[in-house]
Design a protein with these regions (language model features):
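Conserved short beta-strand edge segments in small beta-sheet-based binding/regulatory domains
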Residues: 73-85
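Short S/T/G/P-rich N-terminal loop/turn motif that feeds into the first structured element of a domain
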Residues: 1-33, 37-39, 46, 61-67, ...
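Short hydrophobic/aromatic beta-strand micro-patches
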Residues: 55-57
Length: 90
């Protein structure tokens, strides 16, 4: 299944709000998007606020974006994830 890296610019939110958004994303996925897999997310602090980088697998970029919209989350940039580099395997 194709994998995607989603950049979400969340703005000036708290870590608690980020966690609430994650719970909402999980609930929407479980209820309406069983064909989407949320692998993990990284949360970073920028000068403009919180940003997340989320790795998802799904049948299409459109389906992943539909999940984000249904969860009320931005999907500011969505990239095709080509591969992972694992230093333990180099």
């Amino acid at each position: 299944m194709p994998r995607y890296l989603i950049q979400r610019n969340l703005g000036k939110v708290t870590l608690q709000e980020v966690e609430e958004a994650g719970r909402r994303s999980k609930q929407v996925r479980e209820a309406s998007f069983p064909d989407i897999i949320w692998e993990h997310s990284h949360v970073v602090q920028t000068k403009d606020g919180m940003r997340t980088y989320c790795v998802y697998a799904g049948p299409s970029v459109e389906r992943v974006k539909a999940h984000a919209a249904a969860a009320g989350l931005p999907a500011d940039e969505v990239f095709d994830l080509v591969t992972d580099v694992d230093p333990a395997k180099l």
